[in-house]
């Protein structure tokens, strides 16, 4: 004879009665299939999933229901705004006996993108872009935010100007009494002395959060990444040979930027495609033991 298993979430009342904004699970490992043409392979994601518990008389939610819905989604559907809306709506329906009205899903993963070298044909490497998706179903509507981290290089304009001044002073000191100077002599001097001072530069990180527009059929993550990298002009490279490293040095010289410049460039680029967004940039200074930061939002 089968003996019924107890379910205290249904049969007992909470000793302390209060509504809860969110209840659920954090750190669930799942494979996710992105509905993006550039990503045919599954990505490993860490998921957070919750529903609200507005009724203070109900002791707890049914976490296994949320887990099974998420697990079925991960192995079945491609992730896009429409499929997320269906999943979250099902999570709310699964907790009708808890009087839940809202559901929330957060997915954290990294996009691996193949990036070609700047000049060398056939040379490329993998670059990782951390992504965080936050989807909420409330009042019959989906709100979906995407946060991306993008690495780039920044060279300080002030440091570049100070460097140029030192090189200029050294050049004048060497050739001021020489009268007419042959180009070959100038070239030889520059070969030896053009790096008697160098501007400081550093690896930098932009974190961009956007609200995916209602009616969007896809997330458009790679398009957003490329828009940001293009506006900055100095994306961090993967595999390089000397010609590529030289081209990267040229890009840094052509795109000198303070942290303020980077934040404004990104803001302008993101605002062309999204009405709700925030931008945060961090330059991990090589001159200082602290970072330079700037942020902006819509």
From Swiss-Prot:
Site (described: May be catalytically important): 156
Molecular function as annotated in GO: GTP cyclohydrolase I activity
Pathway involvement of the protein, from the record: Cofactor biosynthesis; 7,8-dihydroneopterin triphosphate biosynthesis; 7,8-dihydroneopterin triphosphate from GTP: step 1/1
Reactions catalysed: GTP + H2O = 7,8-dihydroneopterin 3'-triphosphate + formate + H(+)
Gene Ontology terms: biological process: tetrahydrofolate biosynthetic process
UniProt enzyme class: hydrolase
Protein keywords: Hydrolase
Matches recorded under InterPro entries: GTP_cyclohydrolase_FolE2, GTP_cyclohydrolase_FolE2/MptA
EC number: 3.5.4.16
Purpose of the protein: Converts GTP to 7,8-dihydroneopterin triphosphate.
Stated family: Belongs to the GTP cyclohydrolase IV family.
Entry protein name: GTP cyclohydrolase FolE2
């Amino acid at each position: 004879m089968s003996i019924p298993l107890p379910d205290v979430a249904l049969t007992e009342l909470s000793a302390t009665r209060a509504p809860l904004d969110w209840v659920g699970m954090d750190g669930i490992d799942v494979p996710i299939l992105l509905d993006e043409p550039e990503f045919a392979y599954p990505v490993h994601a860490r998921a957070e999933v919750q529903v609200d518990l507005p009724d203070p008389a109900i002791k707890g939610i049914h976490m296994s229901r949320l887990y099974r819905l998420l697990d079925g989604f991960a192995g079945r559907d491609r992730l896009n705004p429409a499929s997320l809306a269906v999943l979250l709506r099902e999570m709310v329906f699964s907790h009708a006996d808890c009087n839940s009205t809202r559901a929330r899903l957060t997915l954290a993963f990294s996009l691996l993108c193949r990036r070609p070298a700047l000049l060398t044909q056939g040379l490329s490497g993998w670059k990782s872009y951390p992504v965080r998706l936050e989807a909420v179903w409330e009042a019959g509507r989906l709100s979906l935010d995407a946060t991306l981290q993008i690495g780039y290089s920044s060279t300080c304009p002030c440091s570049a100007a100070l460097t140029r001044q030192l090189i200029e002073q050294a050049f004048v000191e060497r050739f001021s009494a020489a009268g007419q100077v042959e180009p070959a002599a100038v070239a030889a001097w520059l070969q030896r002395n053009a790096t008697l001072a160098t501007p400081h530069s550093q690896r930098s990180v932009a974190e961009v959060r956007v609200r995916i527009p209602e009616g969007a059929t896809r997330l458009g993550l790679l398009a957003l990444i490329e828009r940001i990298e293009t506006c900055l002009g100095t994306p961090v490279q993967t595999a390089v040979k000397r010609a590529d490293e030289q081209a990267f040095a040229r890009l840094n010289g052509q795109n000198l930027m303070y942290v303020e410049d980077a934040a404004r460039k990104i803001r302008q680029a993101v605002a062309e495609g999204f009405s709700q967004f925030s931008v945060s940039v961090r330059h991990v200074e090589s001159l200082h033991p602290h970072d330079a930061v700037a942020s902006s939002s819509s």
